[in-house]
Amino acid sequence: MVKKEVKPIDITATLRCKVAVVGEATVGKSALISMFTSKGSKFLKDYAMTSGVEVVVAPVTIPDTTVSVELFLLDTAGSDLYKEQISQYWNGVYYAILVFDVSSMESFESCKAWFELLKSARPDRERPLRAVLVANKTDLPPQRHQVRLDMAQDWATTNTLDFFDVSANPPGKDADAPFLSIATTFYRNYEDKVAAFQDACRNY
């Protein structure tokens, strides 16, 4: 069999998107980010609580385009100790990933509070907050699940959020899906704005 040479894509444009990654402590936010940025090769085995906000930059090439979206992932501490401080890092954030642990009903309920906090922190209240809801640790035995996935899906649908059930534990079931979704949504929104601007110029 002759192997086809995969040529690198020549990126013609790079867009940048700030994304708040939120959820209670220990739900696996940092582990998900690590699995995504390392393409599944690096899982955080030793837990270390995030203090405040840590920024991770992850480039995503949009399929069938020559455009790259750099996700500036704001890995946000889930502890109540930091909630009063972290909103200062959210200036200009209109995209978010809400993460909960399927074995913790409390972590699911807290996503609702995080969602409202993010909406209230928007500098421009007219712009929508585009977010996804992520059920993590779905590899755990069913008897440990406290949150039904259909219940989480219903809440996400009600609030116009995409929903993903994932596992950051290797090999990382669909761990990249939430990030790819955010990048694609940001790209499409950008394209819509460009098209609207071009139409306005033609009609001027």
Swiss-Prot record:
<keyword id="KW-0547">Nucleotide-binding</keyword>
<dbReference type="GO" id="GO:0030992">
    <property type="term" value="C:intraciliary transport particle B"/>
</dbReference>
<dbReference type="GO" id="GO:0003924">
    <property type="term" value="F:GTPase activity"/>
</dbReference>
<dbReference type="GO" id="GO:0005737">
    <property type="term" value="C:cytoplasm"/>
</dbReference>
<dbReference type="GO" id="GO:0031514">
    <property type="term" value="C:motile cilium"/>
</dbReference>
<dbReference type="Pfam" id="PF00071">
    <property type="entry name" value="Ras"/>
</dbReference>
<keyword id="KW-0966">Cell projection</keyword>
<comment type="similarity">
    <text>Belongs to the small GTPase superfamily. Rab family.</text>
</comment>
<feature type="binding site">
    <location>
        <begin position="23"/>
        <end position="30"/>
    </location>
    <ligand>
        <name>GTP</name>
    </ligand>
</feature>
<dbReference type="InterPro" id="IPR027417">
    <property type="entry name" value="P-loop_NTPase"/>
</dbReference>
<feature type="binding site">
    <location>
        <begin position="136"/>
        <end position="139"/>
    </location>
    <ligand>
        <name>GTP</name>
    </ligand>
</feature>
<dbReference type="InterPro" id="IPR005225">
    <property type="entry name" value="Small_GTP-bd"/>
</dbReference>
<dbReference type="GO" id="GO:0005856">
    <property type="term" value="C:cytoskeleton"/>
</dbReference>
<comment type="subunit">
    <text>Component of the IFT complex B, the core composed of IFT25, IFT27, IFT46, IFT52, IFT74, IFT81 and IFT88 as well as associated subunits IFT20, IFT57, IFT80 and IFT172. Interacts with IFT25; the interaction is direct.</text>
</comment>
<feature type="binding site">
    <location>
        <begin position="75"/>
        <end position="79"/>
    </location>
    <ligand>
        <name>GTP</name>
    </ligand>
</feature>
<dbReference type="GO" id="GO:0005525">
    <property type="term" value="F:GTP binding"/>
</dbReference>
<keyword id="KW-0342">GTP-binding</keyword>
<keyword id="KW-0969">Cilium</keyword>
<keyword id="KW-0206">Cytoskeleton</keyword>
<protein>
    <recommendedName>
        <fullName>Intraflagellar transport protein 27</fullName>
    </recommendedName>
</protein>
<dbReference type="InterPro" id="IPR001806">
    <property type="entry name" value="Small_GTPase"/>
</dbReference>
<keyword id="KW-0963">Cytoplasm</keyword>
<keyword id="KW-0282">Flagellum</keyword>
<comment type="function">
    <text>Small GTPase-like component of the intraflagellar transport (IFT) complex B. Forms a subcomplex within the IFT complex B with IFT25. Has very low GTPase activity either because it lacks the conserved catalytic Gln in position 79 or because it requires some GTPase-activating protein (GAP) for GTP turnover.</text>
</comment>
